[in-house]
Amino acid sequence: MIRIGAHMPIGGGFKRVPKETYEIGGNAFQIFPHNPRQWKANLPKEEDIKLFKEGIKKYKIDPEAMLCHSGYLINIASPNIETWNKSLELLILEMKICSTLGIKYLNIHPGSHLKSGVENGINQILKALNTAMEKEKNTFILLENVTKKGGNIGSTLEELKLIIDKAKFPDRLGITIDTCHAFDAGYDITNKEKLNEFLNKIDKYFSLEKLKFIHLNDSKNDLGSNKDRHENIGKGKIGSEGLKVFISHPLIQKIPWVLETPGDNDVHKKDIQEVLKILEVK
């Protein structure tokens, strides 16, 4: 069975997420654990937790297809000690929120070294991950591939490998592959041969077991553009044919897909329908 969904709103509480996931035709989802544009976060209230978990059971959502996405302000690669400390503190709280909700996976962007260099940035990331994962032992952190702009770390599989190889708790680290980010970073996932090379490299560096989620997005920009601007399914430079190559691969079909395309739930419902149409799923 294909597991597919979208990034879902949480305004008014987490309890809304399972039902709305079902209503858009999904059986997987991603959420923010708090307002992503604020440093402040709170643990959810007991009633919200209860209703959320009841909804998960009611709508039969696989726990392996539930994902939290870290807030936008966190930068655990930062050379600025104040920013790094605030990022670490919020990351730990996000892990607690995930654990409270019964969500196993937290997706994070590795961060930007802000001109301090990749090596220094990776060292900062490792310090943060090691500290956070020592304190919160229930959460599995997924490093998302990004585009190479603004000092971002993780635009290549090699950089993600460096982090996981040196981490204190590699067994609780995995990766998320974002199709827009991969395409914009120069990985041609629209070509069968190149896609196989990409997946073989993932298997060689991490094992495919480490690939836990796909962010399924089209791209507004060309291959290798390093822009990172998501587009709705079939309307971008990856396109329907390119996405068909990617999502038709049997290994990709084993992994949950989450859409982060522009628009609200109604738009995401149409995007999910478009994905299934591309796959020729009735």
Curated annotation (Swiss-Prot):
Binds 3 Zn(2+) ions. Zn(2+) 3 binds at H181, D228, H230. It comes from the Bacteria. It is an enzyme of class 3 (hydrolase). One of its GO terms (biological process) is base-excision repair. Its EC number is 3.1.21.2. Zn(2+) 2 binds at E144, D178, H215, E260. Zn(2+) 1 binds at H69, H109, E144. Gene3D superfamilies: Divalent-metal-dependent TIM barrel enzymes (3.20.20.150). Keywords: DNA damage, DNA repair, Endonuclease, Hydrolase, Metal-binding, Nuclease, Zinc. It catalyses: Endonucleolytic cleavage to 5'-phosphooligonucleotide end-products. Belongs to the AP endonuclease 2 family. This is Probable endonuclease 4. It comes from Thermosipho africanus (strain TCF52B). The lineage of its organism: Bacteria, Thermotogati, Thermotogota, Thermotogae, Thermotogales. The gene is nfo.
